[in-house]
Amino acid sequence: DNLTIDEYSIEDVNMNKLARGIFDKKDNIRVSSNNEMTDGYGILKPQGNRIIYTNPSSEDGKEVDATTAVTNAINFLELGYNEDVSYQVTTALEGITILQQTYKDSIVFSKDGSAEITVEDNTNGIYRLTSPRRISKAYLSSKALGTYDIERIEYVINYLYKHVELKSVDDIVLGYEKSYNKSKNTCSYIPAWYIKYNDRYVSFKSLKEAVDKGERLWTGVK
């Protein structure tokens, strides 16, 4: 129903601004030659398409329950993340919270993790957090999706009914795949079906490929 592929310009997250938001010792932030930032406790560094935050002093705490983990994650993210991009919690486990970017009231996924935030914490606090290094900025263009570019929901449901354990399927959502074009320095949001299988969202395309090849399905299919 009038689905489109939407293209946006992208920009890097402001690391200095992020560091000032999340570090406790804001007057003691140091930057190394490889752009690693620290206040003597937490460490913030770019790595591929992601930004990695670690706090080694918090690693040895005890595991917290899922509800506590979500609360801790959201409180921490409000310090400096989420300013220009909306996210929602899609996975809540003991000590691990995963949030996906949202777009047009749906969930965004990416093969390189650039549409998700993963937060790991314990009784000592957040000790590792990975987040996107680049965010979409200005709308550029849209292209109508072809009739056969995406499966009909009836086909998706019928395929799942025939080929997977339905008790492992918690949700079916029409989301978006976030895809980067390095040469143009843009990103596109492409409509696609996603299945929540064994507590993790996977693309229907990836799940179908795995099933058709006779591979065993597991939580980490992307």
Question: Model features per residue range: what roles?
Answer:
Residues N75-G80, I117-E120, H163:
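Structured segments of extracytoplasmic/periplasmic soluble domains
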Residues G21-V31, E116-I117, T147, V211-E215:
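Generic alpha-helical propensity signal that fires on short helical segments
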Residues G61, D65, A69-N72, T118-T123, ...:
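Surface-exposed acidic loop/strand-edge motifs in secreted or periplasmic proteins
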Residues A19, A66-A69, A73, A92, ...:
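A sequence-composition feature that detects small, non-aromatic residues
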Residues N34-P56, I96-Y139, K196-E215:
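Amphipathic N-proximal alpha-helical interface segments
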Residues N124-R128, P132-K222:
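Extracytoplasmic/luminal low-complexity segments enriched in Pro/Gly and acidic/polar residues
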